[in-house]
Amino acid sequence: IVEAHERGMVVPNRKERLSDEDTQAAGAYVAYPKKGIHEWIGSIDINSLYPSAIRALNMGPETIVGQLRPIMTDRLIKDKMAKGDSFAAAWEGLFASLEYTAVMDQQRGTEITIDWQDGGETVHSAAEIWKMIFDSNQPWILSANGTIFTYEKEAVIPGLLKRWYAERKDMQKKAREYEGKDDVQFEYWDKRQLVKKINLNSLYGAILNPGCRFFDKRIGQSTTLVGRTIAKHMDAYVNECITGEYDHVGKSIIYGDTDSCYFTAWPMLEKEVQEGRMEWSAETCIALYNSIADQVNESFPGFMEQAFHSPREMGSVIRGGREIVARTGLFITKKRYAVLYIDKENKRVDVNGKPGKVKAMGLDLKRSDTPVIIQEFLSEILNKVLTGTQREEIVARIREFKYVFMERPGWEKGSPKRVNNLTKYRKEEERLGKANMPGHVRAAMNWNNLRRMNSDNYSMQVVDGMKTIVCKLKSNPLGWTSIGYPTDEMHLPQWFKDLPFDDGEMETTVVDQKIDNLLGVLGWDLKSSTNTANTFTSLFSFE
């Protein structure tokens, strides 16, 4: 707002009475990964994708010229949602509005209405609109959302982002100067650059917040769809560099998430390496993947001009960097994967006898509802898988862990849970006699009730926001299925220890389920292979 005022502009008031339909915008592109173990993985990460997209297309309320009326797109999304899809699921597989796609395909038989910012409207064929944007010397840019911007003047938002981006670069440079020399100064400048990074990334969120004066769904959705289109190009171009095919889900592409691409050239080169026709090492792989990242960066200005009519100078702000090179990786589903990387941003980490470092995303070994002992065990198993340990050895280690875990008392086999709204549910139950609530809240309420029934004034009472350990119970006279005790309770009362804990059920939930979540994609059937109930059969088999 201050920046706009300094330019002599008047900022409009906030829009009122907007429905969800007016504010919902398509989200980021997240691909389904090619599940399983992959070798020699590289990743390219686009620098500040959303802020860069806003700058590259000069997006701002004051630079909007018009909007392709999204009749076809809205109809498609509504039809999908009518069939039960969520708004996000309805956008699955789409990288742009149908109107934008029709324009880029220069479809002569498709008529599209343009709503001009001055209040007028005109109807054209998609082919005519393409010519209007790309072949008429107009200073116009067309976003993947079908929004037309002008680049005659720099908008306030891209101008701010440009300044913040330059300031962050300076702060990062100062942080690097102090790294390893002055910890206090390094931490200071590192935190400063982090704050600036948050500013850069949060501005996109503000544009999509109805409470923001700069709110405009056209800009917000233009940002995400342009981001999707750029990510699709990056994936397709990486695959073209490796296989010769411009395909965003080609043979070399493992996974894509918002602004990053995970790929491997190994399946295409493995035969040549094994036959001795090509040398292969970590150094060779790093050099190859650096070269691919450089080629992708060289492609961006031309792509931005071809896809959006963004001038090459503006399109050049889209840049990617080769982030990691990993020896192996395990990909499970969207947002859940782990890689053992040997190089990060041209800095080797497989030194001093170490195989590298593990980068894990969305796995149970990092979740707060997984017991610490299970987190540590899952980390150990994951490391074994990523370093090439054979199935038989992993099965033996899981079985060994299960025996140790079986010997632990029942109350140590529960799952950590945070209890919220306990007071609300308790009052609701007092008022109605019976209330529906999350299982872990019911378990906490059971602890409080049993504590009162045993006249226990020494044990802690569970209150709102407290962390608990939820333990499952066998059939009992009270009809309870679980109980949750406070994690900070240092001395568990005897009445609690005497409860009929369902050890088997907890072992299945805490061990078998967590292992299956991590390694199920490998198809190793670990549950039956490590079933401790089969011990007698495995020890005494008669043929």
What would you call each of these model-derived segments?
Residues I1-L57, P61-Q67, I71-N145, E152-K153, ...:
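DNA-dependent DNA polymerase catalytic subunits
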Residues L161-Y178, K196:
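Non-transmembrane amphipathic alpha-helical segments
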Residues K173, G205, A236-N239:
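Charged/polar positions within long, soluble alpha-helices
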Residues L203-C212:
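Flexible hinge/switch segments at interdomain interfaces of large molecular machines
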Residues D259-F263:
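A generic structural motif
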